[in-house]
Curated annotation (Swiss-Prot):
E.C. number: 1.17.7.3
GO term, biological process aspect, one: isopentenyl diphosphate biosynthetic process, methylerythritol 4-phosphate pathway
Highest classification ranks of the organism: Bacteria, Pseudomonadati, Pseudomonadota, Alphaproteobacteria, Hyphomicrobiales
Protein's UniProt keywords contain Cytoplasm: no
UniProt organism field: Bartonella henselae (strain ATCC 49882 / DSM 28221 / CCUG 30454 / Houston 1)
Protein known as: 4-hydroxy-3-methylbut-2-en-1-yl diphosphate synthase (flavodoxin)
UniProt catalytic activity: (2E)-4-hydroxy-3-methylbut-2-enyl diphosphate + oxidized [flavodoxin] + H2O + 2 H(+) = 2-C-methyl-D-erythritol 2,4-cyclic diphosphate + reduced [flavodoxin]
Cofactor(s) listed: [4Fe-4S] cluster
Gene responsible for this protein: ispG
Keywords for this protein: 4Fe-4S, Iron, Iron-sulfur, Isoprene biosynthesis, Metal-binding, Oxidoreductase
Amino acid sequence: MNTVYSLSKPLERRQSVAVTVGDVLVGGRSPIVVQSMTNTDTADVDATVAQVAALWQAGSQLVRITVDRYEAAAAVPKIRERLERLGFVIPLVGDFHYIGHKLLSEHPACAEALAKYRINPGNVGFGAKKDRQFAEIIEIACRYRKPIRIGVNWGSLDHVLLTRLMDENAQQENPLSGGEIMREAVVQSALHSALWAEEMGLKRDQIILSAKVSDVQDLIAVYSTLAERCDYALHLGLTEAGMGTKGIVASSVALGILLQKGIGDTIRISLTPEPGGDRTREVKVAQELLQVMGFRQFFPVVTACPGCGRTTSTVFQQLAQKIETDLHKNMSVWREKYPGVESLKVAVMGCIVNGPGESKHADIGISLPGTGESPAAPVFIEGQKVKTLRGTHIAEEFELLLSDYIHTRFGQG
């Protein structure tokens, strides 16, 4: 007898130390957190507030902002205050490079306003200054009781560490490849920095690690190694993933494999937006990834067939698109009005081949007639055929049935 493989869910989540960032819990047994980052000039308070709010409304639970100079640091408390006046309580993460120690020490209001600090051990300082400047940031994090993310990036890797590992490797009888040494340097940089932060007084539940590279296979290897060697909460992301379809595919493959292995506590899909493009797209992709893998439910799922020669009409495509658009548009209200509606499954199918079957598997579904079929559209609710629609108003009638079903199933009154 042939072997039948069974995999009903991803592997058990790696048990990590939970970290509180503002009012969001990262790691432990908490749901995987979606986060994003602004691309505005942080010193431009109006633009940054608008983008942070847009990212949060799209579903980003944490939003990172660049703090690269004194004007940006001075703007941070104003940004938080403005957001709170607008009703947005959003944990802001400060992204620091090169002079983070100065910005945090000279702008205590900035240090207080941020919910977390991101530090890159590869550029926190150089030579004799590195240890002192890293220590300054950790001392400030301890003082204000803020968590940190030690974010290693192979584009700004600690060259002293890398050189040492390469020299040691050269002395081995069977030396590792350059790629293996690079990956080991990324892992060691993150772990050594985290242990050092603990020695300086930062608690284990105040530390999140990330180790970003731009190659899919390297990213999988780095995070798999990191997950084996520690229990810190892990932030997943493929750096410089790129634009459009390529960026989405690369990030989804890399993060999807790691998530399937139980690795990852918070994710960011780093997409390069087109000029004037929508920054919130990366948030939606992250949500879609977690939802299709079964980790979280953010919005109802609309199943629709791709179409073929049996579906020369575009009616089912138009209906599927309209329903999906309407569902997403209404979710901000429906989450409060109809608790659990994000688990809804709707099927809009184009012909008799798979239409009835897929519609039965959905909570509510419709099988529209294909080319040459009888102009009738059976509707199924929770596996049972409840009605057959005919005529020129099939789409409108199905939308009414869908609305009634949502109200009946998820309404609280």
